[in-house]
Amino acid sequence: MLAKGLSLRSVLVKGCQPFLSPTWQGPVLSTGKGAGTSTSSPRSFNEIPSPGDNGWLNLYHFWRESGTQKIHYHQMQSFQKYGPIYREKLGTLESVYIVDPKDASILFSCEGPNPERFLVPPWVAYHQYYQRPIGVLFKSSDAWKKDRIVLNQEVMAPGAIKNFVPLLEGVAQDFIKVLHRRIKQQNSGNFSGVISDDLFRFSFESISSVIFGERMGMLEEIVDPEAQRFINAVYQMFHTSVPMLNLPPDFFRLLRTKTWKDHAAAWDVIFNKADEYTQNFYWDLRQKRDFSQYPGVLYSLLGGNKLPFKNIQANITEMLAGGVDTTSMTLQWNLYEMAHNLKVQEMLRAEVLAARRQAQGDMAKMVQLVPLLKASIKETLRLHPISVTLQRYTVNDLVLRNYKIPAKTLVQVASFAMGRDPGFFPNPNKFDPTRWLEKSQNTTHFRYLGFGWGVRQCLGRRIAELEMTILLINLLENFRIEVQNLRDVGTKFSLILMPENPILFNFQPLKQDLGPAVTRKDNTVN
């Protein structure tokens, strides 16, 4: 049945049957003018508003006026100039950009059973040149689907997620101990400083414990320098990707530029360390017969012979690499917003303490009793999405805003610009988690895309959501969180969005003793 408010031309294009697919349920689209439907004949692709077809000239102006680190602001300015849809060619990369949630719903509804998204060119170049194995991040079609179905059962299914709670709770409690060590070191009754490195280690400890079922020791006083190398390599891999987004990576490789050398070196460390961890834990697991707790994703994959070992290695590598900077950045932004909005922080703390009493300390139950806290993560990703855009290659010809979009066109949904648009989010600069608790579909429909959408959404979504929720519960129980930055820290694009300037936090213990408050039975706040 055709969704109300959409013209036949907007949805039922060649081969697109988003509401009839037997494998997944399409969305119910809301009515309104946002989708720009029209009964007139669709206009041509070349008529889409654009700065011009000279990709190199466009790239020159982009570098001169904005620079790669400000691409998210460049997109906002482009929507203000051209309207809700525009196309732009930067160097060799041409895309159509959209910002309206209704347009996003049409795009994603027509993505088909095997969606294809944009692959970061230097990542592809590295994997091809060095013949590295690939997982679901790089695969497509049936090869992608085969791996993804198996991995969904291990890291997305509700039954699997329950296994991760005790592992992640232990990591979160150890992070609280890290902050108490910092307080003791400063000898001032609180801790003031930057916690980005600690959050990187926390995220790596969390994802590795879920995958391997054992701890890496990243939150101990003395950190394994080899594990720290892995974390540093992930950061370097993201950072060095940006210059090669709009120019052929082979150009950088053939000229033996420092950018390519650093990028390849980072991937080398990621692969070598991930393979080493996988092999070591594999042999340890083979010798074990009795497990007192969930033995991890790797054991489950190996024990069931669910995938070839090389496929397992490739996917484990991608999950490890993708689970460090992304989660840690979202946590840092969440704390930043809470510190700037103390009333919201107190509301969240009250919810957490009530959940602790109701669940009697059972973390698996607690995470089901904190809807406002979960909404705060959504609100954080609205203001500070990890990815500037979500991308899909159109499977068939499509019509958006009454423009013809040919098959195999790269269309990007500008998630950062959408989240800052007052047309979609009233008072968009306000950190207001309650907006996500409203029942009206008009306030939330296709507006939350923090982890992507559909069958190709982020594989680690459920792990990341649980990891962040459990840590925030522990932090809110233990500390009042403030920020020392008087001005906005700014945002820069380094393949993911991150603070332009260091965030200086202040953690004030809520209890007189410096031991982890979560170990106490009472829930009073002194």
Curated annotation (Swiss-Prot):
One of its GO terms (biological process) is cholesterol metabolic process. Its cofactor is heme. One of its GO terms (molecular function) is cholesterol monooxygenase (side-chain-cleaving) activity. Its EC number is 1.14.15.6. A cytochrome P450 monooxygenase that catalyzes the side-chain hydroxylation and cleavage of cholesterol to pregnenolone, the precursor of most steroid hormones. Catalyzes three sequential oxidation reactions of cholesterol, namely the hydroxylation at C22 followed with the hydroxylation at C20 to yield 20R,22R-hydroxycholesterol that is further cleaved between C20 and C22 to yield the C21-steroid pregnenolone and 4-methylpentanal. Mechanistically, uses molecular oxygen inserting one oxygen atom into a substrate and reducing the second into a water molecule. It catalyses: 6 reduced [adrenodoxin] + cholesterol + 3 O2 + 6 H(+) = 4-methylpentanal + pregnenolone + 6 oxidized [adrenodoxin] + 4 H2O; 2 reduced [adrenodoxin] + cholesterol + O2 + 2 H(+) = (22R)-hydroxycholesterol + 2 oxidized [adrenodoxin] + H2O; (22R)-hydroxycholesterol + 2 reduced [adrenodoxin] + O2 + 2 H(+) = (20R,22R)-20,22-dihydroxycholesterol + 2 oxidized [adrenodoxin] + H2O; (20R,22R)-20,22-dihydroxycholesterol + 2 reduced [adrenodoxin] + O2 + 2 H(+) = 4-methylpentanal + pregnenolone + 2 oxidized [adrenodoxin] + 2 H2O. Interacts with FDX1/adrenodoxin. One of its GO terms (cellular component) is mitochondrial inner membrane. Gene3D superfamilies: Cytochrome P450. It comes from Mus musculus. PANTHER family: CHOLESTEROL SIDE-CHAIN CLEAVAGE ENZYME, MITOCHONDRIAL, CYTOCHROME P450. Pathway: Lipid metabolism; C21-steroid hormone metabolism; Steroid metabolism; cholesterol metabolism. InterPro entries: CYP11_CYP27_families, Cyt_P450, Cyt_P450_CS, Cyt_P450_E_grp-I, Cyt_P450_sf. Residues 30-41 have a biased composition (Low complexity). It comes from the Eukaryota. The keyword Mitochondrion applies. Keywords: Cholesterol metabolism, Heme, Iron, Lipid metabolism, Membrane, Metal-binding, Mitochondrion, Mitochondrion inner membrane, Monooxygenase, Oxidoreductase, Steroid metabolism, Steroidogenesis, Sterol metabolism, Transit peptide. Its main location: mitochondrion. It is found in: Mitochondrion inner membrane. Belongs to the cytochrome P450 family. Heme binds at C458. The keyword Transcription does not apply. Residues 30-49 are annotated as: Disordered. The gene is Cyp11a1. Residues 1-36 form a transit peptide. This is Cholesterol side-chain cleavage enzyme, mitochondrial. It is a peripheral membrane protein.
